[in-house]
Amino acid sequence: MPATQLLLLACLVWGLGARTAQLRKANDRSGRCQYTFSVASPNESSCPEQGQAMSAIQDLQRDSSAQRADLESTKARLRSLESLVHQLTLDEAAGPSATQEGLQRELGALRREREQLESQNRELEASYSNLLRDKSALEEEKRRLREENEDLARRLDSSSQEVARLRRGQCPQARGTPQDVPSGSREVSKWNVETVNFQELKSELTEVPASRILKESPSGHPRSEEGDPGCGELVWVGEPLTLRRAETITGKYGVWMRDPKPAYPYTQETTWRIDTVGTDIRQVFEYDLSSQFLQGYPSKVHVLPRPLESTGAVVYWGSLYFQGAESRTVIRYELNTETVKAEKEIPGAGYHGQFPYSWGGYTDIDLAVDETGLWVIYSTQEAKGAIVLSKLNPESLELERTWETNIRKQSVANAFIICGRLYTVSSYSAPDATINFAYDTGTGRSRALTVPFKNRYKYSSMVDYNPLEKKLFAWDNFNMVTYDLRLSEM
């Protein structure tokens, strides 16, 4: 029993210290020895009753609950404080990094903005440079146009003086005689009859010239709505002036034109051009200004509702007149509204290679314009290949009057009409060709001519007369050229 002894010894020592402890020893009912240890209360003089004890216990429990609640509240506040301290610690640790990241983002945005500003600055500098170049080009163009204007003024003055001399009778008049047939026609034996040169040279022998020129009155010709338009007989063709050159192979043959009676919104300066190499010719290039035409910058491209044939098209009173592909139909296409206004078959006209000019190219139907109006040049089986002329109504395309010549169409290279007279070109490739025949619709007579005509580029596929400018327009082997003319007094 060492433990019991130690316990009793401790209690005894504690009792001695307190001087109020009592130890009793007695046997219980079963005979077992019991030790009872009593200690006097330091505060209570007597023991409370049972009810008072319970009340005291409850008070103690309440105090304990309150203390426990205070303890839990304190613990909660401590946890909150610990959380706040932890968050503050994290913020302090992450603060410099976040600030640095924000500064880097701001710096990146500023750099991007600077790059955009620099790019805009470069674009502005490039635009300014382009404007300076355009200004220089415009100044150069202005200078060139001024020089051209001065040259035109000089030529106009020279032409006026020439007209004055002609009116005074200082220029010898052309005489039509049998000797007007070119000397080259008497040298046919020098050529191989199978060569192209011989075929072209034959054109100079096809027509028998009249023995003399008959002086016709103006009343014998189709009348112009403007009265006397300054008509006369062709006596001289100048050197070709090259305006521009086609860019692609489709421009080896072609037709270009200006409207001698322009209708709004077009002007005398508006130019149209068609490249005619190909099987589906529909594009018509339109140039509002002469400078655009010279530089090759069209202001509009028309796409025709049906393809055209060859180089016989013309523009007159705001409409494009052309031959429909592989047909004898002439079509009037109004350029401003881009609509077909009229179609008309030319009775009996050959087409698609039946009666072309000597160079070929399906030039069976050739439209022309002069001071008196719209014409069509063609041939028929009944005419046995001779050139037939018909005056057309420009609105309805009805044939108003027809003339049949005795000039074989396939023996000449091209034809045009001035003041009601048909003129033909002897060769499309010879550098020194001639205007070799003239047919007068006023008298129904024809005669031979020897007016020199230059094929500078040796392949003239189109020759037309512009009555407003009094010039020939031609397409010579990719090149668009003009010729000045001189007409005698009627």
Curated annotation (Swiss-Prot):
Motif Microbody targeting signal, residue range(s) on this chain: 488-490
Annotated S-S bridges: 231-419
Residues flagged as site, Cleavage: 212-213
One GO-annotated biological process of the protein: positive regulation of focal adhesion assembly
Biased composition (Basic and acidic residues): 146-157
Olfactomedin-like domain: residues covered: 230-489
InterPro entries, A to Z: Olfac-like_dom, Olfactomedin-like_domain
GO cellular component: cilium; collagen-containing extracellular matrix; cytoplasmic vesicle; endoplasmic reticulum; extracellular exosome; extracellular space; Golgi apparatus; mitochondrial inner membrane
Pfam family membership, one: OLF
Keywords from the named record: Calcium, Cell projection, Cilium, Coiled coil, Cytoplasmic vesicle, Disulfide bond, Endoplasmic reticulum, Extracellular matrix, Glycoprotein, Golgi apparatus, Lipoprotein, Membrane, Metal-binding, Mitochondrion, Mitochondrion inner membrane, Mitochondrion outer membrane, Palmitate, Secreted, Signal
Glycosylation sites: 43
Residue numbers spanned by region Disordered: 146-188
PTM: Palmitoylated.
Coiled coil regions, renumbered to chain: 52-169
Residues given in the record as Ca(2+) binding sites: 366, 414-415, 463-464
Signal sequence region: 1-18
PROSITE patterns, per database record: OLF
Expression sites by tissue: Expressed in optic nerve head, ciliary body and retina.
Intracellular or extracellular location(s): Secreted; Golgi apparatus; Cytoplasmic vesicle; Secreted, Extracellular space
Molecular function terms, GO-annotated: metal ion binding
Function: Secreted glycoprotein regulating the activation of different signaling pathways in adjacent cells to control different processes including cell adhesion, cell-matrix adhesion, cytoskeleton organization and cell migration. Promotes substrate adhesion, spreading and formation of focal contacts. Negatively regulates cell-matrix adhesion and stress fiber assembly through Rho protein signal transduction. Modulates the organization of actin cytoskeleton by stimulating the formation of stress fibers through interactions with components of Wnt signaling pathways.
UniProt subunit comment: Homodimer (via N-terminus). Can also form higher oligomers. Interacts with OLFM3, FN1, NRCAM, GLDN and NFASC. Interacts (via N-terminus) with MYL2. Interacts with SFRP1, FRZB, FZD7, FZD10, FZD1 and WIF1; regulates Wnt signaling. Interacts with SNTA1; regulates muscle hypertrophy. Interacts with ERBB2 and ERBB3; activates ERBB2-ERBB3 signaling pathway. Interacts with SNCG; affects its secretion and its aggregation.
Protein name: Myocilin
Species, as recorded: Felis catus
